[in-house]
């Protein structure tokens, strides 16, 4: 019981420091590494390449554009049991919000292992892990603040003060 509570405490601690915002795709199943890192290497074939492009509201000039590309493949096929699978993959995502006001880029690597539960490998249990290096950039020259709007119109000057740390953020997730 003590081990259970220790494991639960570790999981809660990890979840509390995690930061994630996944891009939204209408055909999310076509971007397996974006959807779930446990899907890495889970396919029939030698390798898999996936690419997605999403342009939300294309008639509006301040649209949201999201692009992804991923490559994954199975590894150690001759060293694992025939019913087991292991895969590695890489993923790249770029997301432009509001005509480039907020740009998010990240690249990641993923690893997954699938253990066969029966003699044919029809039933498997798998786990996947993914780590990403994320970069967010805010272009404050394109942002409009409340103090820039006066009864006489748009002044173009703001009293907001930004540091480079607020404009460019890099982190590992």
Predicted segments — roles?
Residues 1-24:
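Bacterial Sec-dependent N-terminal signal peptides
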